[in-house]
Swiss-Prot record:
It is an enzyme of class 2 (transferase). Its EC number is 2.1.1.178. This is Ribosomal RNA small subunit methyltransferase F. Belongs to the class I-like SAM-binding methyltransferase superfamily. RsmB/NOP family. S-adenosyl-L-methionine binds at residues 125-131, 149, 176, 194. It comes from Escherichia coli O6:K15:H31 (strain 536 / UPEC).
Amino acid sequence: MAQHTVYFPDAFLTQMREAMPSTLSFDDFLAACQRPLRRSIRVNTLKISVADFLQLTAPYGWTLTPIPWCEEGFWIERYNEDALPLGSTAEHLSGLFYIQEASSMLPVAALFANGNAPQRVMDVAAAPGSKTTQIAARMNNEGAILANEFSASRVKVLHANISRCGISNVALTHFDGRVFGAAVPEMFDAILLDAPCSGEGVVRKDPDALKNWSPESNQEIAATQRELIDSAFHALRPGGTLVYSTCTLNREENEAVCLWLKETYPDAVEFLPLGDLFPGANKALTEEGFLHVFPQIYDCEGFFVARLRKTQAIPALPTPKYKVGNFPFSPVKDREAGQIRQAAASVGLNWDENLRLWQRDKELWLFPVGIEALIGKVRFSRLGIKLAETHNKGYRWQHEAVIALASPDNVNAFELTPQEAEEWYRGRDVYPHAAPVADDVLVTFQHQPIGLAKRIGSRLKNSYPRELVRDGKLFTGNA
């Protein structure tokens, strides 16, 4: 594999020599950093099983190498990488997989290790959504996830990825992660804090990642990380699991942050060793039981993961003085909910008891039941999925609901050809050789729902959201 020139400050190299265990070679570290990062994907098991995905993609000649810590994760090599971007494949557009760096699959693996089955989870720094979508898949869209993102510009990307992957159990918030300890104390069974960091582990993806690096900056970042982990720990219920992770390599932002938490709450913090997380995990194991992944160990990004348990309650933080404001939704009454459920089922949309109908003016929404305890405590940017808008003639079903709830086996499902599916993704109407009978048509490709169309004569009127429409070359090879 070709090499690329990485910028290394001298002080960084000195720090790495001191931080690296004697069992590892510093020359191997430098060599690994100079190699471009291997690409990796994670199969979205909410949409397709790993076995079916491998069968579906077998004709493409992709080389898929299993990732040891994530059974649905694979390193991927494609001979036609330049001909068609991975994100323009049909399987990516329909949410069958997520392009995710291999080491970033580690935190969620740790969160669910040893049979842990949390029902209410928070992802404190969630964008662009790789870990939130991984958590949702592990929960099988049940329970509830609070996915928070401080950066306003990244919340939109987070929602787009959640929607593409067919996820229904997520609530989005846009806050500084330091507010949650006071706002929602002891409310979560599990919390993932993939903390903002100096990014020392990402040089294989970004050779200039360390251009602005300094020891002083690391110390400032670590101070913020201590505040974030303290807040997260307060939001965790006693008995709950907290996973702390970064994509950086210095001890100040990693081990030291976790040790600070234990020193602060010595009777409430228990480190849960990760040496048995997957075969070979002991190669990255620290004396505290954390995983400190230098890039040469598994030929991936540099990463750090710690798992801990909250063994008892800790003193509460002062109650916040802000007002959340009135919640603009009201629950739909049972009789009306039954009528809506029946109408939705007629176009192939079904949901279970984990979701409950709420209404705002003419909008119908489905919220995860597990998030209702947080209503009135935090302000949501977006909650659950928008099911429909009501109008005089019935319901206007929403695209995100189709992707999350539709059964491709519905009687009104209509399978498109590759050329027709590509036209659909370009936002164009489709003219099939034999038009379906129904007026409301669940459009599928590769037996996956990709939208809802209105039949007008021999034409299927496109309802694909304008913001998702794709230009350029797609999966049939036509521009």
